[in-house]
Amino acid sequence: MICYVLVAYILFAYMCVLQKETPLANAAFWAARKGNLALLQLLLNSGRVVIDCKDSYGTSALMVASYSGHYDCVRELIMQGADINLQRETGSTALFFAAQQGHDDIVKLLFEFGASTEFQAKDGGTALCAACQSGHSKVVEMLLKNGANIHDQLSDGATPLFLASQEGHVTIVRQLLSSGAKVNQPREDGTTPLWIAAQMGHSEVVKVLLLRGADRDADRNDGSTALFKAAHNGHCNVIEELLKFSPSLGLLKNGSTALHAAVMGGDPKTVILLLKANADPTLRNKNNDLPGDLTKNERILRILRPQILNGGS
């Protein structure tokens, strides 16, 4: 025991000068972060450490232990009276951190002692948003069973489904859709889950979203569609999935076509895919440019020339 106290004072005395916290409080944070249960118990039982003491960012020892995945330390802090739903300055709670890191055992423990799914970070993020973005399907399942709102939104309008689609977490996408997530719910800038999945090249997510009724031609505020972005970024697998649902190959609200985007992207394979789907190389964009006017790539020009001579047929 004497050894633990000496370690605590030596390691953290200098930290209190920087953070204006007591050495013992800093030692408790260190023990929670490292999973040193014996030291944590010693410090808490000394009566000289406030159970919900915070660092300069409002982080508590329970949040630290939850983030780091130390089940026994989390349980000890809870049993000694730590506030489970205490919020950091950013609005995050212990549940948020455990969900973000995929510590399903700690998420379960926090729920057993009354953790709430309703708290939001300053950007609107919830524990469900964090788990979906990070790809922790088991945690997502637990959160949904314990009342997490599947329609939560970040300040920019992104939903849990949007975040999972953006990161390519197809299992979570399926979970959310099966639990009632709105497949076409856009972000404030008009970006839908399908659009973002297509841009990022997540073909399996695109496939699932389309099969569950995603609008293949939903456009963002700038007029671009999922096919337009996939074509521009050269995501052939995504293009193939989208073409199965007959998306628009004509002029979009942005005054351009997917073929224009493919040509600008510079990948001959995407150009070939669109031409085989009957994209018209004779359509001009809002600047009166043909797709072929937008490149000096000889491979692409050789692909386009016969089509143009044949009138796009």
Where are these regions (language model features)?
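Ankyrin repeat domain, specifically the short helix-to-loop turn at the C-terminus of the second helix
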Residues: 42-49, 75-82, 108-115, 141-148, ...
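Ankyrin repeat start-site detector
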Residues: 23, 56-57, 89-90, 122-123, ...
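Conserved ankyrin/ankyrin-like repeat signature
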Residues: 39, 72-73, 105-106, 138-139, ...
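Ankyrin-repeat junction/capping positions
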Residues: 52, 85, 118, 151, ...
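Ankyrin-repeat-protein effector appendages
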Residues: 3-6, 10-28, 146, 179, ...
